[in-house]
Amino acid sequence: MDCEDRFVLTDLPSEKADGIVTNHTHRCRGCAGCISSNKGTCAIDDDFTNIIPEILSHRVLEIRTGIRDSQFRMPMRKAVERLSNVLQAFTDAGGNIPLDKDSVALREIDIIVDGVRTDGFETYARELLDMGPVEEVTFRYE
């Protein structure tokens, strides 16, 4: 696969990442603008908001992070929850008229976990990310 078609998002120290999630990433406020008034766009003003369009413009999102209590650890959890809400704009969630999946490139999410597999994590991650334009979510543990 062409490297240009992959966006690497991490909360781990890395020089190879395209986007780094920091403690300055805010939690979703629940305004639902991403599925109603500003479909596919997050209303929060922080660095992660600027990364979302980049993620959607690549065929593959590679998430590199650790897990805690069978969930993404902070701050990645905040970022993934917000991305999940944006992905809902491409579904009929809440009676929404979905955005066209072909308007974005994203189709696959590869989650590379720094640690060992824990019960429930993959189900949790798929519930958040396997929707809208995403056709496949895969996992690897290092």
Which residues fall in each region the model found?
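N-terminal beta1-alpha1-beta2 submodule of the flavodoxin-like/Rossmannoid cofactor-binding fold
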Residues: 1-86, 129-142
